[in-house]
């Protein structure tokens, strides 16, 4: 699965894209998808009305996009906000619980990502899942409304995947990625 889908090639790293085109979204410890409603928190694609975004992004979450065509890109931005009880999407339908909800975490997919938790929320910018960061985007832990944040990045020209790894205590939501 790629983010560029029917584009016949990599997306141009210009303008902005909805965050929900991510082709990788994991905290390294997630249940496999099903039509059940899970009562555990994990990164997910969701919506409020017509607005689509990634939610429940917590420490160590990996968000990946394949592929972009980079040309003279020196900074990357995101439209993000801190997840609060007021903006968190609450499921209001009937529960269809899956017995896997209560399985131990070590039975789910695990990936190793180097990095240290951060007191200030930060998104590392990477070109590979486990590679060294090429930049970072510092977020404001008080931003409860959609806010655009930018970070400098050293990205060589050419085609590449783009990954973000989140470090921080509060959960965040991500609406757009920007170039």
Which ranges hold each PLM region?
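Extracytoplasmic
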Residues: 1-179
């Amino acid at each position: 699965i790629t983010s560029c889908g029917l584009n016949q090639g990599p997306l141009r790293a210009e303008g902005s894209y909805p965050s929900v085109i991510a082709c990788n979204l994991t905290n390294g410890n997630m249940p496999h998808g099903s039509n059940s409603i899970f009562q555990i928190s994990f990164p997910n694609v969701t919506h409020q009305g017509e607005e689509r975004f990634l939610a429940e992004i917590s420490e160590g979450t990996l968000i990946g996009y394949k592929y972009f065509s980079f040309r003279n890109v020196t900074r990357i931005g995101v439209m993000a906000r801190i997840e609060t009880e007021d903006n968190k999407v609450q499921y209001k339908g009937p529960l269809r619980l899956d017995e896997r909800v209560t399985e131990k975490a070590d039975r789910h997919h695990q990936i190793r990502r180097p990095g240290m938790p951060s007191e200030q929320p930060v998104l590392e910018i990477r070109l590979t899942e486990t590679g060294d960061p090429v930049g970072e985007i510092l977020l404001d832990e008080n931003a409860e409304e959609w806010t655009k944040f930018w970070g400098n990045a050293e990205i060589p020209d050419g085609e590449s995947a783009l990954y973000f790894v989140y470090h921080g205590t509060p959960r965040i939501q991500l609406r757009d990625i920007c170039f």
